[in-house]
A protein has these predicted regions:
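Short glycine-aspartate micro-motif
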Residues: 2
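Membrane-embedded transport module
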Residues: 5-167, 193-194
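C-terminal transmembrane module of polytopic membrane proteins
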Residues: 133, 137, 145-233
Length: 233
């Protein structure tokens, strides 16, 4: 990694990876802290991405063999991507803590931890589907709405879990992350209730899905903490 000092030529600054704008060692320490904070944001993105893909594919696969049809429509898939994009982008400005030791990419451990969390998220959606089908008699066109709302709500709460290596309440998320999460929750509560572009559920059922998603997903913080500690994340 090339390092240029403040009085270096423009050519040297342009080719360097880091430019020290002040004298002394403090600026070097600050650069290391910033780089480790950036790594933590990237790690959160990777864990969230892997967990999301595992959960999404698992729900579609198990749901198809269970109900013998797609449990999420093409429009629902598009809306899910839309909801996830904003919260994913907001990770770039999230509040994170730098580590005291150098960071390394341990792909195996990251994948194993993400796989375990993804499987738990699959079970969460299946439980919500079971409750909706057998206790609230949700079938037909309403089932894809139920699955969509659960996946969207769970994705918003999931990022609040995986962004923090300790307990999820150990640090406050960034403002952009909180705003995007709140906005997505409100938007899809309205979509699910009024049925503007998707089949509607009653407001009570939408709130039930929101509550179950919050309960199950935030409950994942306990196995997440153990997994991250075990795999050195």
């Amino acid at each position: 990694m090339g390092i240029a000092v403040n009085n270096s030529t423009d050519v040297a600054k342009a080719s360097a990876s880091v430019v020290l704008t002040e004298d002394g060692i403090n600026v070097i320490v600050d650069a290391i802290k910033v780089s480790r904070e950036t790594f933590q944001r990237m790690l959160s993105w990777v864990i969230n991405k892997e967990t999301k893909v595992i959960g999404f594919v698992g729900v579609l696969t198990v749901g198809f063999f269970w109900l013998h049809k797609l449990v999420l429509s093409l429009l629902g898939m598009s809306l899910l991507v839309f909801a996830n994009d904003f919260i994913t982008m907001s990770l770039a400005t999230d509040n994170v803590k730098h580590t005291s030791n150098p960071n390394t990419w341990n792909v195996k451990n990251i994948t194993l931890a993400s796989l375990a969390l993804g499987i738990l998220l699959i079970l969460e959606t299946l439980v919500v589907m079971f409750i909706g089908k057998h206790y609230f008699h949700i079938t037909g066109k309403e089932m894809p709405t139920l699955v969509l709302l659960n996946l969207v709500f769970a994705s918003q709460f999931r990022i609040l879990i995986v962004r923090e290596r300790q307990r999820f309440w150990s640090s406050l998320p960034g403002r952009e992350l909180l705003l995007s999460t709140f906005g997505a929750l409100v938007l899809f509560v309205l979509l699910g209730t009024y049925g503007w572009i998707i089949p509607a559920l009653s407001f009570y059922r939408v709130l039930l899905v929101l509550g179950l998603s919050a309960l199950f997903t935030l409950g994942l913080d306990f196995p997440k903490y153990s997994l991250f500690k075990k795999f050195g994340l």
